[in-house]
């Protein structure tokens, strides 16, 4: 992570920083400096990848330090964090424990599935959600599956974790798909089915996905 800050002779401020939401960052910089947003220019370098990393996380960006240093020394400051500092201060992926239950018909095919995720989700970290803490992104990979299972229940139980979370690439899918597919393998074993044949059966009305398989 890096940032460059420069105060101009007219009192305006220019900041160069990788980001996914320039207006959001400019508003935050205005709060930190007391400047009018019209005095602040945020330059968004067209380089690298974002992958959910460059949002407005509380401790995971060096631009507040670059601005403070530029103001203190009266000259432009470019700040680059070491890899050690980046990993110490950065956000993490969502973490969850998911409890699954399922039911099989007399023919061994799944007829019901329940997945309850004990997790926080990253939306609270970026948006400061108040009151309602449920986060749809935390259930990605559990909800919205194409498998033709007649009875489904997908739920989140809010559990606050010790670390600040962020929207790293694929968010909920990065863990929940593994959980869900592993449980399907268990259902296949319990029902005496081949895991591949079970998936073909559950996707039998979806030619696109059966072709993909």
Predicted regions and their residues:
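Generic beta-strand/beta-sheet core signal
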Residues: 16-18, 43-45, 80-82, 105, ...
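Glycine-rich loop/linker segments at domain edges
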Residues: 1-3, 95-182
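Alpha-helical support elements that line or immediately flank enzyme active sites
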Residues: 3-73, 126, 130-142, 167-207, ...
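Acidic/polar loop patches that form or flank catalytic/metal-binding clefts of enzymes
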Residues: 75-81, 110-112, 195-199
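Short, well-ordered, mixed-charge alpha-helical segments that flank or form enzyme active sites
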Residues: 24, 86-89, 120-124
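Structured beta-strand/loop patches that form or line metal/cofactor-binding pockets in enzymes
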Residues: 77-100
């Amino acid at each position: 992570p890096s940032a460059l800050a420069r105060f101009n002779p007219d009192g305006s401020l220019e900041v160069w920083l990788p980001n996914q939401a320039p207006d959001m960052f400019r508003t935050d910089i205005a709060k930190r400096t007391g400047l009018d947003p019209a005095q602040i220019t945020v330059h968004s370098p067209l380089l690298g990848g974002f992958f959910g990393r460059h949002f407005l996380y509380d401790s995971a960006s060096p631009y507040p330090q670059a601005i403070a240093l530029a103001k203190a020394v009266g000259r432009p400051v470019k700040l680059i964090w070491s890899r050690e500092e980046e990993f110490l201060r950065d956000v993490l992926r969502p973490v969850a424990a998911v409890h699954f239950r399922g039911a099989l018909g007399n023919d061994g095919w799944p007829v019901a599935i329940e997945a309850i995720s004990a997790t926080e989700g990253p939306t609270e970290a970026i948006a400061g959600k108040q009151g309602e803490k449920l986060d749809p992104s935390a259930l990605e990979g559990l909800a919205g599956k194409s498998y033709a299972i007649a009875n489904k229940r997908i739920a989140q139980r809010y559990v606050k974790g010790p670390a600040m979370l962020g929207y790293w690439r694929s968010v909920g899918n990065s863990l929940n798909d593994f959980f869900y597919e592993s449980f399907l393998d268990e259902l296949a074993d319990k029902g005496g089915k081949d895991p591949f044949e079970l998936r073909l059966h559950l996707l039998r009305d979806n030619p696109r996905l059966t072709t993909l398989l």
